[in-house]
Amino acid sequence: MIIQFFFTGWDLCATLFGVVGKNKVNMNRPLELSNQHFNKALTRLPLGVTSDFRYWGKDQTIYADHAKGGRLWDIDGNEYIDYRLGYGPCILGYGDERVDAAARAGMNIGGVFALSTERECSVAERIAKMVPAAELVRFSNSGTEAVMAALRLARAYTGKDSYVMVEGGYHGIFDAVAWYTPLKDWDPSQGDPKVTPMSEGIPELIKELLHMVPLNDANRLEELFKKHGDKIGAFLIEPMMGNCCSITATRQYLHDARELCRQHSVIMIVDEVKTGFRVARGGIQELMGFKADLCTFAKAMGNGYPIAAVAGREEFMRLIGDDVIHGGTFTCHSVSLAAAEKTLEILDETAALETINDYGSRLRKGMGGILSRRGIAHSFVGHPSMSGLFFSEVPPSTYRDWAKTDYRFYEALAPELHNHGILCEPDSREPFFLCEAHDQACLDETLDKFERALNVTIKNFGSNSKHVAC
């Protein structure tokens, strides 16, 4: 007998910005100081936070005090093994002495100058060494900015304004990419789900330029290109969807998409904001054996210091400074750039990634064994360094697959994990991020606490679960 969880959930849009307050869980850890600060913060900050994704509900939003290695402490003194890591940036761990020493040296240089420094070239050379598609590089401050630049470049080069995104992908919060396809009330017999803005204030006119396709369906992409290819300038894809359970494009799909883009003069933009320098030294492009026209990086690039990059083929990148504008006051701040230089050196020249991947494989095996012993259907998707946990035997290959089974069981399990000192994202679509500092003690403790939290969750759900024989 295998337990399969099916539930009638709440609108996926509610989880889009981390709003988990509807899933009330008894807190057996003290959050008094976080709750007090939340009420104070509400007087000056919308939702009491400075990013919507940090709001976890009125009584569940926590505030960090400090972090070190793979662990984080909140202001109430609760200690967690952290598998969020700021949504992936801290790939070596919090407060890595090697990177922080480099950052302090960068601080002594002066900060920002409205001039360039020699280090910019050395970091660009490192990126080009690690990622063959990165013939030329321009730096930004965030993944959102890097994707903005890539889309602008693609439109400038092709002279075509329309673009394609993949359902379930995430590319930041600027107007052109802040769209999704809600599936709660979608009827497949009525055609594709409606393309919807993630927020009020995004002009509906933008939708006239946007096309969305399901992942891993090259035929759909080909049909779209044949019909509208003369107007489409860019295909924007996150091959491992970091905000959708790490659902991953197949190698064949990526190679097919690469060829279709070539045939129809569409620029292939690969968003590696989360996968870059994490799943391999050369990112998802190395894993899958293909080269983007343009690609974007951030997250792991600076081990938590704010820095990003857009990179790509020289013929596209040379448009910058000629016909395409790009810049920013804080771009290549001396602290962030020094941190990136050291982080990339470590990732390129040491076994850090192998250490992370080994930990991730052992974590999957341990968690999988615990779930299997209880007859709970499950699968892992993505990469060991950023695993998505899916409560079904068959892993999803598209966003539509993910949405077929609601995630209320995960959404009940996650707060119990928090109670037991394991910090994962309340939103089931965010993967478990790992860092080099996660060690054997972290693994042993994680598996013990995962098992205990799982037992509590199963007990609390009781008759809400349905048993399906497979």
PLM feature spans:
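Conserved N-terminal phosphate-binding loop of PLP-dependent enzymes in the Aspartate aminotransferase
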Residues: 27-470
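Short, Lys/Arg-enriched N-terminal segments with co-localized hydrophobic residues
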Residues: 16-26
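Aromatic (phenylalanine/tyrosine) cluster motif
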Residues: 5-7, 17
